[in-house]
Amino acid sequence: MEYGVNVIPEIDIPAHSLAFTHYKPEIGSDKYGMDHLDLYKEETYRFVDSLLDEYLSGEKPVFIGPDVHIGTDEYNAKEAEKFRYFTDRYLKYIEKYGKNVRMWGALRWLKGNTPVKADNVTINAWSYDWIDPNASLKDGYKIINTCDAYLYIVPAAGYYRDFLDTKWLYEQWRVGKVNPKEELPEGTPGLLGGMFAVWNDHCGNGVSQQDVHFRTFPAAQVLAEKMWRGKNEMVSYEEFEKLCKQMPEAPGINLLGRVQGEVVFPGQNEELSLNGTDSIATMLPEIGYPYAVEFEINPDKEQNINGILFKGLIPPYMPIGKIRESWLSAVTAIRLYSTLLHCLPEHGRRYA
């Protein structure tokens, strides 16, 4: 908060809760899977109460901002009444600490008679099937457009967008377009705005932190423009995109690895002979996407190689073990390994 950024923490309950059931298996649901908390066990409520108390109470609480998110998405619809009771209970539980509470839309999918607190509650409107935006506003909820069809990024997954369609968002989307079937009028009271979401569903698939940033920065730019200005027919998307590429990420920040101007290295296109311990470095700490690296490897008789083949800030690439059995592996800053399907050659064979 001291830097002017409100980080909204989320403890995702009662589904998507494997982190808790790994620690405490007895509160997991035998019927619906261990990613669901068992809503019929008293121990579940004792555990969640103590967890929230730990993060929200005391002289130095962990959650210091004004808002806290409690998840509540994608619980099994067969338990609608119990889910609604659980949700209502923890909306009130968080509020007693003086926090504004947020939740994912679920009450269209989990219809029922059990009332769920609406005052001072903000809902992420993420799916037509799960939330009725008009009914939610009528009941007194505030909503944020987080429509999965338009605003979800799930890198390299195949079932949601890998990159947002920034051109379509700039030219066609508006914050009232809460899902493909429903649209709210401009200026609808209770519609606070919109946001995109990134879900890294697949770990170890070769997608690095930089890869995620490469996807999210253009999304942040176009949504910021739409939130502040709305539709702008005076500036084409092509002009807007050109301006975006000229804008830095922040003072002194270059996570995209942009290189200004054309770089020509002396001695390019010339053959260089190394003695086995040499290294070559450029004046550039990194080069962002799009880029390509081409090189050849012609190993000598020594087969035991364990070292970095080439590296930038993120990630280094290295052969592991003996050359003939090795693969190129990418190692990120958080030590996740991803394998590139290229075997290094034996002595006397060239690799390119």
Where are the regions a protein language model picked out?
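Trp-centered recognition loops
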Residues: 340-352
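Active-site beta-loop-alpha junctions enriched in small/polar residues
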Residues: 10-16, 73-75, 106-109, 126-128, ...
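Hydrophobic faces of well-ordered beta-strands that scaffold small-molecule active sites
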Residues: 3, 7-11, 66-70, 101-103, ...
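Flexible, acidic glycine-rich loops studded with aromatic residues
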Residues: 113-121, 127-269
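Acidic, contiguous N-terminal accessory segments
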Residues: 101-110, 117-119
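N-terminal active-site wall of soluble small-molecule enzyme domains
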Residues: 88-93, 107-113
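Substrate-binding cleft of carbohydrate-active enzyme catalytic domains
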Residues: 1-97, 101
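Extracellular glycan-recognition modules
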Residues: 264-337, 348
